[in-house]
Amino acid sequence: MPLPDFHVSEPFTLGIELEMQVVNPPGYDLSQDSSMLIDAVKNKITAGEVKHDITESMLELATDVCRDINQAAGQFSAMQKVVLQAAADHHLEICGGGTHPFQKWQRQEVCDNERYQRTLENFGYLIQQATVFGQHVHVGCASGDDAIYLLHGLSRFVPHFIALSAASPYMQGTDTRFASSRPNIFSAFPDNGPMPWVSNWQQFEALFRCLSYTTMIDSIKDLHWDIRPSPHFGTVEVRVMDTPLTLSHAVNMAGLIQATAHWLLTERPFKHQEKDYLLYKFNRFQACRYGLEGVITDPHTGDRRPLTEDTLRLLEKIAPSAHKIGASSAIEALHRQVVSGLNEAQLMRDFVADGGSLIGLVKKHCEIWADD
């Protein structure tokens, strides 16, 4: 399928997607009932969309195009109410978190969807292992060239986005020692990590044409880069965050990305070059492994900086942009999180250290999601 022309979007508009866990009490393992829930709510959603993701234990909540985080929060709140009622009617529960702490990937059923079945044919068991749960944020762009500039700019802050959203310390019944283990699942995919270097939209079109020769890539949706352009929406999509435990944190993460995008495209603070990516995977690993306690390294100077310190610096830089687009509350909340030194991954570990079980942890996550 040829790459569509870049759809012109209103700059800095938002679209947010949350991949939620559908669980089956009292054992709180993943359920295989997302299709049933989607059928139950499809005529009750007035804004946004509730839809499938890869496997039947995943439920995606997606906003419409929103002008700001307040509009997105309103849409999510309304969807949450409908979904929670449908889940209760079917004796199911819903929660966030980047991984389910003890599910077995072999039990996961891939959705009966042509695209997902084709992906299963291409990638085999890797698709079942990809039963993990992330937050994706789309930001509108006026042109393809703006999208490429924005993608490179946001890529500098991938470690910050991962560390702030880290919520997947447990996997397959084990403490992984990672703050965010979810991104590791995709390491075997041939398109894992950053997009190959291009400097403008014309070069991106040539890149996509080359990738399509593999016969594994039919559309941009078949590419699993950390950040990717979405020409049919006219957006750049950031895909590195774990699904948070609360809607409020998800909205705050979206506000962070929207404000960072506004700062990048209005100030143009960087002259991007391919060398920017030289230490990308090392810095990304630091964020996944240690969260905000990680240390990132500048590929140009060799300077090493604690992620906590660098994240506070980013929040300070983008504060004026956040004010202009109505996202100041998000930046203030994230600032408090960084200063406190707490993240959701550590809160999960604290629960288990205090004697809680992994079943109890999922139960608590369901309560947190329902009460937010």
UniProtKB/Swiss-Prot annotation:
Gene3D superfamilies: 3.30.590.20
GO molecular function: ATP binding; glutamate-cysteine ligase activity
Keywords for the protein's UniProt record, in alphabetical order: ATP-binding, Ligase, Nucleotide-binding
A single GO BP: modified amino acid biosynthetic process
Catalytic activity: L-cysteine + L-glutamate + ATP = gamma-L-glutamyl-L-cysteine + ADP + phosphate + H(+)
The UniProt record lists the keyword Transcription regulation: no
Function of the protein: ATP-dependent carboxylate-amine ligase which exhibits weak glutamate--cysteine ligase activity.
Family to which this protein belongs: Belongs to the glutamate--cysteine ligase type 2 family. YbdK subfamily.
NCBIfam families: gshA_cyan_rel (TIGR02050), PRK13516.1 (NF010040)
PANTHER family reported for this sequence: GLUTAMATE--CYSTEINE LIGASE 2-RELATED (PTHR36510:SF1)
Quaternary assembly: Homodimer.
Protein name per its UniProtKB record: Putative glutamate--cysteine ligase 2
Native source organism of the sequence: Shigella sonnei (strain Ss046)
Recorded name of the encoding gene: ybdK
